[in-house]
Structures are given as structure tokens and as C-alpha cells.
């Protein structure tokens, strides 16, 4: 089972984006995920980590929920 963290910038108003990613991951992988944790941050951060590996960082990647789900998939081992 996998723990996923979605770290988002609170002052930047990225909560909705973090919730969208969390919802998409839970809908796609369901019980194959141990937990999806929303982690508050600042300084424009928006990153997704699966099993302690960064799979998305907005400083390096363009925001795309489907791409984030695909990046998480190898860590979950679920069939989608």
C-alpha cells in the first residue's frame, strides 16, 4: 500500500487544486492507496509525492491531473 502526499501553497489558494488531485487519485486507485495526505505549504509549492518520491513538482512540470495520476500509478501498482 502506498502513502501519497499532495503539498500545496495555502497563501496561493491552491487548496482546490490539491483536492482535485486527491479526488482523482482516490477515484482511480481506490483501496490500493493507504492514504492521500494534504500537506500545507507556502512559497508557491505544489508537489505530489508517492512512497516518499516526488512524482510532480510545479517548478518542473506543467499542472495536469491526468499526468499526475499516470506518474503515481507505478508506485501504486494498480491497474487503471
Regions found by a protein language model. Name each.
Residues 1-30, 38:
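Local sequence-structure signature of Cys/Sec-based thiol-disulfide redox active-site neighborhoods
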Residues 34-47:
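Short edge beta-strands and adjacent turn/loop segments
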Residues 54-80:
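Non-catalytic, surface beta->alpha helical segment in thiol-disulfide oxidoreductase systems
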Amino acid at each position: 500500500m502506498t502513502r501519497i502526499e499532495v503539498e500545496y501553497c495555502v497563501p496561493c489558494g491552491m487548496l482546490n487544486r490539491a483536492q482535485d488531485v486527491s479526488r482523482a487519485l482516490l477515484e482511480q486507485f481506490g483501496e490500493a492507496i493507504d492514504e492521500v495526505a494534504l500537506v500545507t505549504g507556502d512559497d508557491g509549492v505544489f508537489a505530489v509525492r508517492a512512497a516518499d518520491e516526488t512524482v510532480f513538482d510545479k517548478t518542473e512540470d506543467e499542472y495536469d491531473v491526468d499526468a499526475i495520476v499516470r506518474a503515481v500509478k507505478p508506485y501504486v501498482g494498480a491497474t487503471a
